[in-house]
């Protein structure tokens, strides 16, 4: 039971961290024209820990629960009264996928629905080139920004253990040392461009 509680609180904290990044982007450089003091969670001069500690008590239980799950295929709800915007995610590791409708996998066919089909991560890893991994992440995040995404559901770091796994192409091979080396510059490049990353998968997908 304690583990479940800790897991839920961890998910809430990570979600709040993500929305604070969005709030920072929305409030950066803005001027209110008043002398009212910003709440701590909106104050970019405060540490992330301080901002998280300030905003969590402001959230109702219902709002905390809502932040922990999706409202559509690739978005989570915000909290309008606190200025927390919606969180828009993209899947996956080697490109910005085509848009789908809100609650179905039907193609949305929007006008900005364009992207580059980057080489699979297995190909990237086979280069053993850390600089190339950084350039890969940089290019991917540029397209994610263009498509107004907040979180990249990537990279895939599961270790290839069986050739029957239908998702091996999302991963970086069977060598955990190589995976750890390639994933880091990939992640940093995406984050440096203002996009959060969601490293996956937590469990079981080695055999999927």
Question: Language-model segments: which ranges?
Answer:
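Glycoside hydrolase catalytic-domain context in secreted enzymes
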Residues: 25-208
């Amino acid at each position: 039971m304690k583990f479940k509680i800790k897991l839920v609180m961890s998910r809430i904290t990570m979600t709040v961290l993500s929305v604070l990044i969005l709030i920072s982007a929305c409030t950066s450089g803005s001027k209110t024209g008043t002398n009212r003091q910003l709440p701590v969670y909106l104050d970019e001069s405060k540490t992330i820990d301080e901002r998280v500690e300030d905003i969590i008590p402001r959230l109702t239980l219902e709002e905390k629960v809502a932040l922990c799950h999706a409202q559509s295929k690739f978005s989570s709800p915000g909290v309008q009264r606190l200025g927390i915007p919606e969180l828009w995610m993209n899947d996956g590791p080697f490109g910005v996928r085509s848009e789908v409708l809100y609650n179905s996998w039907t193609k949305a066919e929007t006008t900005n629905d364009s992207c580059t089909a980057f080489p699979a991560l297995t190909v990237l890893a086979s280069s053993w080139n850390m600089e190339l991994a950084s350039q890969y992440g940089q290019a991917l995040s540029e397209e994610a920004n263009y498509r107004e995404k907040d979180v990249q559901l990537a990279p895939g770091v599961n270790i290839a253990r069986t050739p029957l796994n239908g998702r091996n192409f999302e991963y970086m091979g069977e060598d955990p040392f190589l995976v750890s080396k390639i994933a880091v510059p990939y992640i940093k490049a995406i984050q440096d461009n203002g996009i959060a990353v969601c490293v996956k998968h937590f469990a079981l997908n080695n055999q999927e």
